[in-house]
Amino acid sequence: MNKANIFCTDTNMKVILFSEVSVGISANSILFISHLCMFLGESRPKPIDLYIAFFSLTHLMLLVTMGLIAVDMFMPGGRWDSTTCTFLMYLHIVLRGPTLCATCLLNVLWTITLSPRNSCLTKFKHKSPHHISGAFLFLCVLYMSLSSELLSITASLNLTSENFLYVSQSCSILPMSYSIKSMFSTKMAIREAFLIGLMVLSSGYMVALLWSHKKQAQHLHSNSLSLKASPEQRATRTIMLLMSFFVVFYILDSVIFYSRMKFKDDSIFVCVQIIVSHSYVTVSPFVFICTEKHIIKFFWSLCGRIVNI
């Protein structure tokens, strides 16, 4: 079977991919709308609400782009020209950068929010939402500018090439030259190592804070221990669960990617990698939705208002 045609013939992959994209778009939309409304509706808005809205928006954009590509994978008859193919593939690859930036900065921001008053991070607690949105946009633009080599990728309607990087019904994108590929891989490895290292440091700091807070609470309430977790503990567990999902899916994505490079004739790795690489952005909003009860209450009240109109 031609590798280019596996997307059209494998019904299981089609169902899994479209289900993943649909669920991810729905969950991220709920998270985005709820936190944006909470940020705009409060008299003293919390910066963390705005940033979680940014976090879900980047995931939403990535999944929408993937949905457009998936439609072209499975629907017969190519409809894209070379320009459309290049633009969507470039946009999809580049959007993975802001997703990583959003996860990293969310981790750092949560660490700052939960830090004690005597911490050196206290001075960053009262920064306005403009500083947060500005920092996020700056990192996104910087990340995208460092990916300028991707603009040189070639979109082609030739689906018979054995060296394709990505294939849909309309186009295949051929590999970059060795020099461009080496430069891009080096810069990508450096920035991903920096962002992941920052996440590891902030996660370790939060674990230390959680342990210290737990010991202090046990010492103060040794005679009447409460089984109810504090808001700080719940927030720390949420972000640690989020980081755990990120690490697991990142490792799986890397393993499948290198397996795909090794077994070039086994095109099933292409489909599996697409599904795994979008699993984190699909699962992550459920971490917030399931742990933050006010999101569920917000949507129940919103549905009640709509019914009463």
Swiss-Prot record:
Keywords on record: Cell membrane, Disulfide bond, G-protein coupled receptor, Glycoprotein, Membrane, Pheromone response, Receptor, Transducer, Transmembrane, Transmembrane helix
Organism of derivation: Mus musculus
Gene inactivation effect: Mice lacking all but one V1ra and V1rb gene (12% of the V1r repertoire) show a lack of chemosensory response to a subset of known pheromonal ligands and changes in maternal aggression as well as male reproductive behavior.
Similarity comment text for this entry: Belongs to the G-protein coupled receptor 1 family.
Function: Putative pheromone receptor implicated in the regulation of social and reproductive behavior.
Bilayer-spanning residue ranges: 21-41, 51-71, 86-106, 135-155, 193-213, 238-258, 268-288
One GO cellular component term: plasma membrane
Domain of life assignment: Eukaryota
Topological domain spans for side Cytoplasmic: 42-50, 107-134, 214-237, 289-309
Alphabetized InterPro entries for the sequence: GPCR_Rhodpsn_7TM, Vmron_rcpt_1
SUPFAM superfamilies: Family A G protein-coupled receptor-like
Compartments (UniProt record): Cell membrane
UniProt protein name: Vomeronasal type-1 receptor 46
Disulphide bond pairs: 85-171
Pfam family, one: V1R
